Design a protein with these regions (language model features):
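N-terminal regions immediately upstream of nucleotidyltransferase
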Residues: 1-53, 57-66, 77-89
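Short, low-complexity, polar/charged sequence segments that are solvent-exposed and flexible
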Residues: 71-74, 90-93, 139, 148-151
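Generic hydrophobic/packing signal
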Residues: 73-75, 79, 102, 106
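Histidine-centered divalent-metal-coordination microenvironment in nucleic-acid enzymes
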Residues: 57-76, 117-133
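Catalytic cores of NTP-dependent nucleotidyl/adenyl transfer enzymes across multiple folds
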Residues: 22, 32, 99, 107, ...
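Residue-level marker of positions within ordered structural domains that often coincide
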Residues: 39, 103, 135
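A gly/proline- and charged-residue-enriched helix-loop-helix capping module
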Residues: 90-106
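Short secondary-structure junctions
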Residues: 45, 49, 104-113
């Protein structure tokens, strides 16, 4: 009878849930390209890191192999004012503008607007969900578009969520995230 080594078996199990290094590299490269495109079109910048964040399970560091990557891209507040002044569903127009921006980089991928996000579906099965957001001037988070039911704005603060999760991970001897 063989001895059961729970620790080794659990580590193997955890490793089997993770993305390969190649997949992680592809995700990072796509994130940089998406960020660069948004920065070029909205911020007059070529930065691949400014004005964007991983959110959701990938951003919290709790994802197992995932087929969707959620990111928030910050758009200048002047754009919020422009789309908020539309008579009807400026939120939908904002997503259409973001979609058209991303199509400049990803013309051969399926890029579509849906609800609160612009989806980019890649041929390897990984989908990016890009949420455009506007930072509140008081630093209390962001508002983002909801195109449903005629359009509205919702609030979020992903930085607080990620910070709270990281705090709790530290409090649990780094056992919350593996």
């Amino acid at each position: 009878m063989s001895e059961i080594n729970i620790s080794v078996d659990f580590q193997k199990f955890c490793n089997s849930l993770r993305m390969s290094d190649n997949t992680v590299s592809n995700v990072r490269n796509r994130y940089h390209m998406i960020t660069k495109r948004i920065n070029q079109d909205f911020w007059n910048s070529d930065s691949v890191v400014s004005h964007s964040w991983y959110v959701g399970s990938y951003g919290r560091g709790t994802s197992i192999y995932t087929s969707d990557i959620d990111i928030v891209v910050e758009i200048p507040w002047t754009e919020y004012e422009r789309y908020d002044n539309y008579l009807y569903n400026g939120q939908s127009s904002l997503l259409a503008t973001l979609r058209n921006s991303l199509l400049k980089t990803y013309s051969s991928s399926k890029v579509s607007a849906d609800g609160q996000v612009v989806d980019i579906m890649f041929s390897d099965g990984i989908k990016f969900e890009v949420v455009p957001a506007f930072r509140y001037s008081d630093g209390s988070g962001f508002c983002y578009p909801n195109t449903n039911n005629g359009g509205s704005w919702r609030s979020m603060d992903p930085e607080v969520e990620i910070g709270a999760f990281n705090y709790r991970n530290n409090e649990t001897n780094k056992n919350l995230k593996k």
